[in-house]
């Protein structure tokens, strides 16, 4: 018998999709058509790819007439070797955003729930809506402590999985790996840990992947490896969890350039160390400068800073003022962050331009 969706259910799905698209369309474009902007709103890494990585991309164009591997095996094996795992513990994706979408599809259905630390990556709200699921937003503890009790008991106990990022986006705060391990060890649920910014942090939970079958770790080459436009991401976890995701992954989900660049980055990871040192240095320089200008800046372990603006204005006002000066920063939809901006850390000239604009705006405010 052919199964059909009831009119009421169809209406609910369409209503949910309409709300998702409305929210997407309300966001300012993250890629302005005017190349004159200093772009500090999406945490991209503005440094050039190493020469060897660029050469791998050019060489891949010679194979543009061939389909890529449908199982990403070369890239998965390269990642497994680089991170001391086996290939069946690795899934490769068209950025970690594709992998997040797969996780929601694999583990959630209408009416299910997922627990997420809040504030967190806003994209997860849209993914939950698309699955007809509920997003349970659990507030971070004081001083960004991991609220283990709240995640293990209460409403979060019924969640299909727990999602958190370390370092966290948008705050940049970092949770000690011992606390992450305590959560994973005590939880009966899958714990999805997004480590998109981990190369700017003091430690990683990678060593826990072989210890716990309920930990799924996400990585991306968009932030610390300057490859956001090429779209390379990974998931590391137990073979059964990885297999469940790969079973619903589209064939040829990555192209030949993504494969080649991903393998090359893995082979040349050490060449990015200077890039990472520069970003950490600029992050501290900008933090100190903003603090002197009256901003309250959260200590960060990522390639961005969350800054609470001086009293009297909000984040939207500062975003608009900076945009008029061709500087793009992020404003945030999270409750309690209305008076904040998030600033990506780029090159020294970019950060000099940002600080000069902030000083100019601050001076104009004080003279009134």
UniProtKB/Swiss-Prot annotation:
SUPFAM superfamilies: PLP-dependent transferases. Pfam families: Aminotran_1_2 (PF00155). Gene3D superfamilies: Aspartate Aminotransferase, domain 1, Type I PLP-dependent aspartate aminotransferase-like (Major domain). Pathway: Amino-acid biosynthesis; L-histidine biosynthesis; L-histidine from 5-phospho-alpha-D-ribose 1-diphosphate: step 7/9. It catalyses: L-histidinol phosphate + 2-oxoglutarate = 3-(imidazol-4-yl)-2-oxopropyl phosphate + L-glutamate. Keywords: Amino-acid biosynthesis, Aminotransferase, Histidine biosynthesis, Plasmid, Pyridoxal phosphate, Transferase. It is an enzyme of class 2 (transferase). The modification N6-(pyridoxal phosphate)lysine is found at residue 223. The keyword Amino-acid biosynthesis applies. Its cofactor is pyridoxal 5'-phosphate. One of its GO terms (biological process) is L-histidine biosynthetic process. InterPro entries: Aminotrans_II_pyridoxalP_BS, Aminotransferase_I/II_large, HisP_aminotrans, PyrdxlP-dep_Trfase, PyrdxlP-dep_Trfase_major, PyrdxlP-dep_Trfase_small. One of its GO terms (molecular function) is histidinol-phosphate transaminase activity. Its EC number is 2.6.1.9. Homodimer. Belongs to the class-II pyridoxal-phosphate-dependent aminotransferase family. Histidinol-phosphate aminotransferase subfamily. HAMAP family: HisC_aminotrans_2. This is Histidinol-phosphate aminotransferase. The lineage of its organism: Bacteria, Pseudomonadati, Pseudomonadota, Alphaproteobacteria, Hyphomicrobiales. The gene is hisC.
């Amino acid at each position: 018998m052919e199964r059909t969706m009831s009119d009421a259910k169809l209406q609910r799905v369409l209503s949910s999709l309409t709300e998702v698209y409305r929210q997407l369309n309300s966001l300012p474009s993250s890629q302005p058509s005017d190349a004159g902007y200093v772009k500090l709103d999406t945490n991209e890494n503005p440094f050039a790819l190493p020469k060897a990585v660029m050469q791998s991309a050019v060489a891949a164009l010679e194979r543009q007439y061939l389909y890529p591997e449908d199982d990403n095996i070369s890239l998965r094996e390269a990642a497994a070797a680089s991170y001391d795992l086996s290939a069946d513990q690795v899934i490769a994706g068209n950025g970690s955003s594709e992998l997040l979408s797969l996780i929601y599809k694999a583990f959630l259905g209408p009416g299910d729930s997922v627990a997420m630390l809040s504030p967190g990556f806003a994209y997860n709200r849209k993914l939950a809506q698309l699955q007809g699921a509920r997003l349970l937003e659990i507030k971070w503890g004081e001083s960004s402590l991991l609220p283990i009790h709240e995640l293990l008991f209460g409403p979060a106990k019924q969640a299909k999985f727990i999602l958190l990022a370390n370092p966290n986006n948008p705050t940049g705060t970092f949770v000690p790996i011992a606390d992450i391990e305590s959560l994973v060890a005590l939880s009966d649920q899958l714990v999805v840990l997004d480590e998109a910014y981990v190369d700017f942090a003091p430690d990683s939970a990678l060593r826990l992947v072989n210890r716990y079958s309920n930990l799924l770790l996400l990585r991306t080459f968009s932030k610390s490896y300057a490859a956001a436009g090429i779209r390379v991401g990974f998931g590391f976890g137990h073979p059964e969890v990885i297999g469940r995701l790969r079973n619903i992954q589209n064939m040829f989900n990555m192209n030949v350039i993504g494969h080649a660049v991903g393998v090359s980055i893995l082979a040349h990871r050490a060449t990015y160390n200077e890039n990472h040192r520069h970003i950490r240095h600029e992050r501290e320089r900008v933090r100190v400068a903003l603090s002197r200008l009256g901003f309250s800046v959260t200590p960060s372990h990522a390639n961005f800073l969350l800054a609470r603006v001086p009293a009297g204005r909000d984040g939207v006002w500062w975003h608009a003022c900076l945009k008029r000066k061709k500087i793009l920063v992020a404003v945030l939809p999270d409750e309690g962050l209305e008076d904040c901006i998030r600033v990506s850390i780029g090159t020294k000239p970019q950060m000099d331009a940002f600080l000069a604009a902030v000083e100019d705006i601050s001076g104009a405010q004080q003279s009134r």
